[in-house]
Amino acid sequence: MSSDFTKTNSYSNKLIEHSVHYRTYSNIVDIRTIKAEYLIAMKLMAGRKYKKDLSDIVGILNEQHKQGNPITFEMIDKAVIELYSGWDKIEKDNVDFLKSVLKEENLENLFAEVMQEELESKSTILEINKNYPDLVKPDNINEILEKAKKKKDKK
């Protein structure tokens, strides 16, 4: 694991218990794999609306469904509890998003929609950062995106 990743909020020291060794490169880099529901749990924890966390969740659910291995809320719940000791640290918006995605039948269309929203959010953040360099912080980014969306919807 990269040292940068271990500093993110989606990192859990329990990941090693739920991952499987895949390969070692040059006797230096260990590559490990993890079940899809654990990856979804990590994406929920990160939950960045301006990166690809939410579209990744839709994409993972879609691919697993296509492969005949649909992922249930119960599977994700188990992964969240095992990695993060519960849902307390996951934003309510992300939990609501997951529940709505699990009810969705057309995940391919939803994937495209969510991906577009993420691209727009990223563009919004970059524009705001350009105009107000010190305004955007990790703890206010969702609020900024929400205000920008409301402003755009009024137009």
Q: Where does each model-flagged region fall?
A:
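Compositionally biased terminal segments of proteins
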Residues: M1-K155
